[in-house]
């Protein structure tokens, strides 16, 4: 989709958004370490007809830009996709990079859909599902060597419907 643009907070290699930059350099924007400004840029792009995918570490995306996400994306229901990378305690970068409150911050916002895939295969389905939603979405993305696998989960992701995972 030529309307899709990518924005990153100076973390292209770490979040693998450099792959988009290489494929579509004119649709890739690096805001530097200025997450709040990046949300404002994404809001303006969405109002102009683009579909921004904003990518940063979960902790920085949700904490540093919470007010902008609420006022510029969630309340006006703008079509912006937020991809928060390394949520929870999974990061090796220490407490400053641990997003333990990102779900609480995003869950209270109106009009915002939250999607958290459980595996690499489901991540691809989650991104496709997010792209189909006309409105703001928070994708909570993990990078973990542990794979939670369930064929039904990987094949049939339906936003708003949970699936059971069985630990074997």
Task: Go through each PLM region and give its residues.
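Thiamine diphosphate
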Residues: 1-140, 145-150, 154-161
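Conserved small/polar residues in nucleotide/adenosyl-binding loops
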Residues: 166-168
